[in-house]
């Protein structure tokens, strides 16, 4: 079972990042008029901000997670290079940046107004292949000091010897994670994990026309390139962790998108830090997905702290973020993950129109039968068919929010669309596949919907007593006088 308390112990992670470093510069201000010189908006700059970018952003993400981070890359002997070094020192990143007299530090300047990026200005050189040899030599001297290597490829020349770097790390017993830029994934042969986004996956020949096609082509790519695992980032579709024999999908966990800049850096930094600290690959991927959801709600190339990650993980684990209700598919994925972690899933259902003490006591009893409680909740249309035209008193959204606030409830999933046949939770029970099916009232097991399915699959059915004198109908009559 995933222990979130371990997120307080990431100081044990030691990660060497090697790749193309750059300086991210932001000009931020307001826009309220069009220039008289050309049909373009005028931004009145209120403030500027400089941040470590590219591979250096990966390193700073590791440092903000409390991991030990080092960055190896190339900069120019210039003002931006010195500024980048100073930024990394402030963020507690050990920098091994090789200076070139005849090159300039890569920088990307973004003009931002009202949380929108309006234009980006790139100033960059591609470093000569000969300099990659200098990087390779310093890498050989550093590699023994770290247990995980992250290769952050932006195709600027730092990683011209990438194959040699990977082989040296694997020979030394290190995990190697690669954020690829090349269309030829075989350049990263021997990597432990590769983390392409959907565009990079397609550019490398991946087929994303369907989930089955994606899995098939991803596995073929892993086999052809000699790579162990792929963590495919799929934007609003979440992430997919794929090996030659298994796969896991993690739905996107984003409440608000402000800026996607650097989200891929956060993913590989979080994954590398957690793997370095001894986390299971699947747990590390799930948490990396949550980290991406946190960072895209921030402006620019941002970072995530262990406290933010732990808080988001605990919220998403039981879907209790205020005002947030995951989709049915998201909830089912969370439930499946909990079951894989050895947790006992309990299911019950009802209308729960006006929540009262009888409901609360019953739900607490149901939760006590296992580790996680799933509540199937009749839709408004379903309640109306079952209880009459004046019901429900409270809308589905309100009922979901009230139930989700209870400590004993982990997931609330609505059911019962526009047909009478769906007024029972039978199909939902089959999808949840609980170890325990709980029902309150004077029932016999053979009259409980879904009981036969649960028992056939090794589960049990529990009939719980109701609280005398407590009912929604009684409350409504009492209010009406």
Curated annotation (Swiss-Prot):
Residues at the active site: 265
Region (Ribokinase) residue spans: 1-320
Highest rank taxon of the organism: Bacteria
GO cellular component: cytosol
Molecular-function GO term, any one: heptose-1-phosphate adenylyltransferase activity
Family designation: In the N-terminal section; belongs to the carbohydrate kinase PfkB family.
Official protein name in the record: Bifunctional protein HldE
Naturally occurring in which organism (per UniProt): Marinobacter nauticus (strain ATCC 700491 / DSM 11845 / VT8) (Marinobacter aquaeolei)
């Amino acid at each position: 079972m995933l222990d979130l308390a371990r997120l307080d112990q990431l100081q044990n992670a030691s990660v060497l990042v090697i790749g193309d470093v750059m300086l991210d510069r932001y000009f931020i201000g307001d826009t309220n008029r069009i220039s008289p010189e050309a049909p373009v908006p005028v931004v009145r700059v209120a403030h500027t901000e400089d941040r470590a970018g590219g591979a250096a952003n990966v390193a700073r993400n590791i440092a903000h997670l409390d991991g030990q981070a080092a960055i190896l890359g190339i900069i120019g002997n210039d003002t931006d290079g010195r500024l980048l070094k100073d930024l990394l020192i402030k963020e507690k990143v050990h920098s091994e940046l090789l200076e070139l007299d005849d090159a300039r530090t890569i920088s990307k300047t973004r003009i931002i107004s009202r949380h929108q990026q309006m234009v980006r200005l790139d100033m960059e050189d591609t470093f000569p292949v000969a300099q990659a040899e200098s990087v390779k030599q310093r890498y050989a001297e550093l590699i023994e000091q770290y247990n995980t290597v992250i290769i952050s490829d932006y195709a600027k020349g730092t990683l011209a010897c990438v194959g040699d770097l990977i082989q040296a790390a694997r020979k030394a017993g290190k995990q190697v994670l690669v954020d690829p830029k090349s269309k030829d994934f075989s350049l990263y042969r021997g990597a432990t994990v590769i983390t392409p986004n959907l565009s990079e996956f397609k550019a490398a020949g991946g087929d994303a026309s369907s989930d089955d096609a994606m899995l098939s082509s991803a596995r073929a790519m892993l086999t052809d390139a000699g790579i162990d695992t792929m963590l495919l980032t799929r934007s609003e579709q979440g992430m997919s962790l794929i090996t030659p024999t298994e796969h896991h999908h993690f739905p996107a966990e984003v409440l608000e998108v402000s800026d996607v800049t650097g989200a891929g850096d956060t993913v590989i930094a979080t994954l590398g830090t957690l793997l370095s600290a001894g986390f299971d690959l699947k747990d590390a991927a799930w948490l990396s997905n949550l980290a991406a959801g946190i960072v895209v709600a921030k402006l620019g190339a941002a970072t995530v702290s262990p406290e933010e990650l732990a808080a988001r993980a605990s919220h998403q684990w039981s879907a209790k973020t205020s005002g947030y209700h995951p989709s049915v598919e998201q909830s089912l994925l969370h439930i499946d993950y909990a079951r894989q972690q050895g947790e006992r899933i309990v299911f019950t259902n009802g209308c729960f129109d006006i929540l009262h003490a009888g409901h609360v006591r019953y739900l607490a009893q149901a939760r006590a039968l296992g580790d996680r409680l799933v509540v199937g909740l009749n839709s408004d249309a379903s309640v109306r068919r079952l209880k009459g035209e004046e019901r429900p008193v409270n809308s589905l959204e309100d009922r979901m929010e009230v139930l989700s606030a209870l400590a004993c409830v982990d997931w609330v999933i609505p059911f019962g669309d526009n047909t009478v046949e769906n007024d029972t939770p039978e199909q939902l029970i089959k999808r949840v596949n609980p170890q325990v099916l709980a029902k309150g009232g004077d029932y016999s097991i053979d009259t409980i919907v879904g009981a036969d399915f649960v028992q056939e699959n090794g589960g049990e059915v529990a009939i719980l007593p109701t609280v005398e004198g407590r009912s929604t109908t009684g409350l409504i009559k009492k209010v009406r006088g």
